[in-house]
Amino acid sequence: MINFNTLFEAGHAAGLTDMEIYVVKNDNFSCKVFEQNVDSYSASVTQGLSFRGLYEGKMGYTYTEKCDDSSIPFIISSVINNAIILEKSENEELYGGDEFYTTLDLYHPAFNEITPLEKINFLKAVESECFALDPRVKSVNYCAFSNGTSEIMLKNTKGLDLSERQNFAYTYASVLVTENGENKTDGDFIISTNFTDYEPKSFAKKIVSRALAQLGAKKVKSGTYPILLRNLVAGDILEAMSDIFSGEAILKDLSRLKDKIGMVIASPIVSIIDDPHLENGMGSSSFDGEGVATYTKEIVTNGVLNTYLHSLTTAKTFNVAPTGNASRSSFKSSVNISPTNMYIKPTQTSFDHLLTIIQNGLYITDVQGLHSGLNGISGDFSLSASGFLIKDGKLDDPIHEITIAGNFFDLLQQIEAIGNDLDFGPSNIGSPSLYIKSLKVAGE
């Protein structure tokens, strides 16, 4: 590993003032099973570092995968050359740190003792259980396992010296079912660093039952319907629109929430939380990509917008404190802004009670086309969808080949009820099930 002090000394000698090093090490495993054979297998250890430094008032950047002292001359010269060619500075600053950082339990060493063979045997068992459940299961078209450990170190010349280690694990499987020439597919995740949660029989049963429930799907007539959005669908839509809360998007006029702090932007029953300390959260961390201590915040409270999400740079522009939402997707990336674990606050209302409230409408369990069918700035969307009829307060026939259309900002205002079934899926952004007063539906 590169000697941080030697790097900083070389930087000072070359004319750099403030400097920062960000090191990431990843140890990842993945495998996939198909027809009881290992279809793919990968185990890798990668590491890299990014370095930035202030030269003549401008912040230069570089990165490398060569993390030893022999790379120091390259790192220093690259940062200086990068700073020289910058036409202007965005007044970036390095952070000196906070007095207190919350200690989080993000690393679970027991999981790393699980052998590759145990994971492969689990996948084979899932595949076997799926086929054993129903003769209409024609294929387990995806059955995979992934886990890994990530270590981050962040140190600068202003006294910041932070590190954090966390691990993750998840599996995903999907099945294809066939009846009378009709094909349907569905899948599900298990996300946990406790291997006892990986139970093949119950996992397979959930996947197969969901796929079989879609057989015999019908179209519905075009019109305007009360809509119940499945929790994962609502979370996916929120994730696709999450940049609207970024201070950077506000400054670039890429969000309709500009100048809306303190104003009503959603139904009074809606609160949106960003919680970096959530247990088992995919985005949990005690510090952000710039070393700012993270904390839980309500972005929206009872429909009112409280705050944007900020890095050091945007916080300075808005003359507010940073929110701990600076992010780096990898050691190669520059500092951006993103949520940690963001979600719509659940209530005590059960899923069955939501159905009772709606009485008659549509339950949307899947949408397609979020990248092409949703405008992340205007909020307009038109998405292919499938799900179930809601009739007399109960789930009825499956439906497919429909399109739901509307606007995200209008949707926030039309939320009539919120469930208790908060789910993130394989993401850091989640939601409970949402009852939307009405959406336009194109069918037959």
What does each of the following model-derived ranges do?
Residues 1-444:
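N-terminal small-residue-enriched
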